């Protein structure tokens, strides 16, 4: 696979983390004008952009390999665990010190989160009052559930028609699971139940399925490379559609089955198109070196950005006023965003070098040793 192809995937991750940071900075200013607040809230769907990129890159790696034996599958799990777990566990330690849980330490909550099982109960995410071991950790739990299923899915879903069938099955499964989940959660507060049904894995499965559709669409030789200006025009249309999804409440709730056109699905379709265009015309301003570097650092940035989004207003001595209202709130939002982004990526640069990269190197060593032993036994 060429470097240029990997460049656009890094860029996608860069845009995803900027969307997520924008959303969480926006939540700090509840009195911003409503249309602006709704637009920043759309950054919530940056997680779905991450999920699409994850499915796409895993499929690229899977199809590059010539053999998919037990050693390969074992190596896949080792690589995924050591890619994510070290920074995730470090984040848990950082937040335990920086934002101590009001409810106190809970060994069971920590172990459930460390096992990436935290998206299977409202108390574990939590959407009820409780200790969130790593802010935003729900998406990492969802990602690990996808990892657990990925080898089986990659074996079964081997073409564009099968990917489309997978999406149809995933959508039906999500709707059915959310219907049953709503009944199961009837005793919980409405907000806790609704948030859980958005976060949990069944509601996100169709997004990963769209990642499979995207992979086979990109690999199809029937679609020509786009020219630069047609690509820009197409992306402007995608941006306009995404802004429409963000601004108009007629689209309804966030949970599949809650409306005929849930925004999670509409946003994912828009992001899918965005990635497809970048794959066909990667030499765009949207894949510039800075955004690609942000993509490389995006996981550490995801784990750490809450620290700065929550902390900077406190540390600023009043310069960043989260109680501001109206247009003044917009100015303070811009100020917080403008400081939180570079400080987050400065910290992420260190975390990537000191925590993520050693984990990846350890994975490579373990995989190399396992492969050598398998060859010797053969």
Residue ranges and their predicted role:
Residues 4-7, 35-47, 128-142, 182-210, ...:
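Interfacial loop-to-helix transition and helix-capping segments at the boundaries
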Residues 30, 222, 311:
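Conserved protein kinase catalytic core
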Residues 1-183, 292, 297-298, 316-378:
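Membrane-cytosol interface segments of multi-pass membrane proteins
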Residues 204, 208, 232-357:
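Alpha-helical transmembrane segments of multi-pass integral membrane proteins
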Residues 20, 199-200, 301:
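A composition/secondary-structure signal for short, hydrophobic, low-basic-content segments
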Residues 57, 114, 213, 270-277:
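Specific aromatic-rich, kink-prone transmembrane helix
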Residues 25, 64, 220, 304-307:
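N-terminal low-complexity, intrinsically disordered patches enriched in charged
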Residues 149, 156-172, 217, 221-240:
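Hydrophobic alpha-helical segments of polytopic membrane proteins
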